[in-house]
């Protein structure tokens, strides 16, 4: 099919006006600089729309075939990176339409029958975000897999657990790693729920009131893989709740990534020494030749604030908008695109860091457990098992710790005879009860850090990690 020569058409609304738009205002008004990212989704929506128009008899089959051919050409250009939007096009929708008319002639102007850019952009956004959520869930799945592999390798490794960044109780490293796997498991589930909210088709809602043409919205939704159609046309074109929910879910993921990053940064310091950074995932200093800097987790931690800002910006944009569509909603895209890009990059970087960028130091972790009073709670528990009220036991152990600090010794340095001077309930087994490995092993309550409990928790996490994705759809890009 040859390309007919067609004269350039004005903006889709320009016939209402006598004068021309000031170039500065045209630049200010345009979104083509960033919404061009929606091109494959805009074309996909148009292909479904034209198929529906033909099925409903609004277009002839010949017209639909011509338009479909043109849209497929645009798809190929986009895939090859050769699509160049018309300089006069103010947004991706009109860029597609102008290129279509250039390819197929006047029949291309029939594509926009029965729809508005308002329901069109709402559809594009949902298609885009549904696709990106699938990619992000896959990235979370990979990160969880790395954490599970590390946990399996470190079931027997112990280290201090912290509260208030003070050593608290000995725990297993696997237990610590599985705590993050739990967070990212919740994130994976949460994104799945957001996807359900995204998977609603607004196409056919028109500018705000629907259309008088006999369209079939259910058919369009089916062709685009949507679960259902929107119920109210006013709400459909102005609803951005699903974007807020996505930004909130993304922010939570970055909270978890940032917390993990903070711990890697601390653990890589000489003050902790629990991990060392490999050359593949660290940088140096331009001045201090001895430095090895944890730039990757620092950047993840820093980028979290950027994503939080996009959530707040969207909420502020939406809070004062009357129904239905307002131009303010053009501002929903750049933050969304940046959040998606940033989150993808952070997940990829953290997965790589955990897989190849850090080496745990079990000996240093074990030594740190021996250097403190993190077994003090177990002395109190020992007395409780002897029938002494916990509060009484707690007070007594606090006094023992104070005495040890004054003498510059640890609990493990106390001989049995000294223990007995504190309370007659202490017997020879107190010496083994406060050994770090024994302390960890006895934490057998559900969800605890006991070796046996953690092994069972790991098996459950591995089993759910092997479950198939609830969505079998293949991402478009």
From Swiss-Prot:
In the UniProt record, which is one GO cellular component term?
cytosol
Its recorded reaction(s) are: 2-(N(omega)-L-arginino)succinate = fumarate + L-arginine
Keyword hit for Secreted: no
Query: InterPro entries attached here?
Result: Arg_succ_lyase_C, Argininosuccinate_lyase, Fumarase/histidase_N, Fumarate_lyase_CS, Fumarate_lyase_fam, Fumarate_lyase_N, L-Aspartase-like
Its GO biological process annotations read: arginine biosynthetic process via ornithine; L-arginine biosynthetic process
Leading EC class: lyase
Q: Where in the cell is it found?
A: Cytoplasm
Question: Per its UniProt record, what SUPFAM superfamilies does this chain match?
Answer: L-aspartase-like
Q: What is its EC number?
A: 4.3.2.1
Question: What pathway does the annotation place this protein in?
Answer: Amino-acid biosynthesis; L-arginine biosynthesis; L-arginine from L-ornithine and carbamoyl phosphate: step 3/3
Which keywords does UniProt give here? Amino-acid biosynthesis, Arginine biosynthesis, Cytoplasm, Lyase
Q: Does the keyword Lyase apply?
A: yes
Instruction: Say which domain of life the source belongs to.
Output: Bacteria
Please give the HAMAP family that the UniProt record associates with this protein. Answer: Arg_succ_lyase (MF_00006)
Family (UniProt): Belongs to the lyase 1 family. Argininosuccinate lyase subfamily.
The protein in question is named Argininosuccinate lyase
Q: Identify the gene encoding this protein.
A: argH
